[in-house]
Amino acid sequence: MLPAVGSADEEEDPAEEDCPELVPMETTQSEEEEKSGLGAKIPVTIITGYLGAGKTTLLNYILTEQHSKRVAVILNEFGEGSALEKSLAVSQGGELYEEWLELRNGCLCCSVKDNGLRAIENLMQKKGKFDYILLETTGLADPGAVASMFWVDAELGSDIYLDGIITIVDSKYGLKHLAEEKPDGLINEATRQVALADAILINKTDLVPEEDVKKLRATIRSINGLGQILETQRSRVDLSNVLDLHAFDSLSGISLQKKLQHVPGTQPHLDQSIVTITFEVPGNAKEEHLNMFIQNLLWEKNVRNKDNHCMEVIRLKGLVSIKDKSQQVIVQGVHELYDLEETPVSWKDDTERTNRLVLLGRNLDKDILKQLFIATVTETEKQWTTHFKEDQVCT
């Protein structure tokens, strides 16, 4: 496990290092309902944040609240001396799963090594015993890389879906972590975790002055203009704000439409160049041109701003109108992956079709990005070469 960042007093409490103490939950699910659930996709929520921020406390809280969910917990790595390491091998169906621990209420804990795919695939062999997965990452993990694996593996995608990314920020050390400078101009881990989040929990607010919480909140909002920000103590939060968000699927289309109308553009704080930009362009987009627009941002990484700095998109989200399609289409991009999916919402005949996009990233220029997007809508390609060229790929 990677070492904690910061001083010794940032270490996790002992309770933070151990697997959550789980209590038995009554279930009234019938055998028929359980069988029918075997074919249903299971949501996965990624919980991320620096060591000591309160990730395991949140897990503990979720698992001991009354919500009638049967939850499987995936721990990215077991901490040294963790109580889990005392009993990692369990017998299931005559086979030995060395990395799995089945707890007394039927919930599961496991250690995810390498890219985590094998562990999750093994977990899916136990499908029917749980209906929700919580995945806790290490403190320095990039949640974008973790989220990407749910899109890359088609077989895995038939069993599960990514529901949302929750980032927990320590009220006392959050500003310090967000301001940390990395070599070669890289984005630090804390900033990337905040930028990718669907919900950000500012935790331990009772341990710092209110003014410090306000500064931290403003900094977080400057990085992520779309995610919900919640202030918590001991990671206690209304579970409807962190579970069943449907942040990455077509069911989020209706709520996303309202949310995108009120997303503010942001300015960088703490000398960071991470911002949220949003724009709207009326009309229809040709799907192949829209793919070209997104691929140049996420794959080719050859789009530059007015200062000739590379634009780096960390997360992309929006609702678009695709030519010859009656349904609104949601676009999602994380890391170097993206997806277009039709929503259940149709465009009304008496309303103007439009495209709303929100991009979170570094060195983003709203005017240039909007200009490039307009090229996909108007189907004119003369503007495309203005700010990206094949011989100017960002490295």
UniProtKB/Swiss-Prot annotation:
Region (Disordered) residue spans: 1-36
Binding site for Zn(2+): 107, 109-110
GO molecular function: GTP binding; hydrolase activity; metal ion binding
Main location: nucleus
One Pfam family named in its UniProt record: cobW
Superkingdom per UniProt: Eukaryota
Keywords assigned by UniProt, alphabetized: Chaperone, GTP-binding, Hydrolase, Metal-binding, Nucleotide-binding, Nucleus, Zinc
Intervals of motif CXCC motif: 107-110
Protein name, entry field: Zinc-regulated GTPase metalloprotein activator 1B
PANTHER family: COBW-RELATED, ZINC-REGULATED GTPASE METALLOPROTEIN ACTIVATOR 1A-RELATED
Reaction equation(s) it catalyzes: GTP + H2O = GDP + phosphate + H(+)
Subcellular localization(s) per the UniProt record: Nucleus
Limits of the CobW C-terminal domain: 274-377
Composition-biased stretches (Acidic residues): 8-20
GO CC entries: cytoplasm; nucleus
Known role: Zinc chaperone that directly transfers zinc cofactor to target metalloproteins, thereby activating them. Catalyzes zinc insertion into the active site of methionine aminopeptidase METAP1, which function to cleave the initiator methionine from polypeptides during or after protein translation. Mechanistically, the N-terminal psi-PxLVp motif binds to the C6H2-type zinc finger of inactive form of METAP1.
Natural source organism: Homo sapiens (Human)
Sequence similarity: Belongs to the SIMIBI class G3E GTPase family. ZNG1 subfamily.
Binding site for GTP: 49-56, 110-114, 203-206
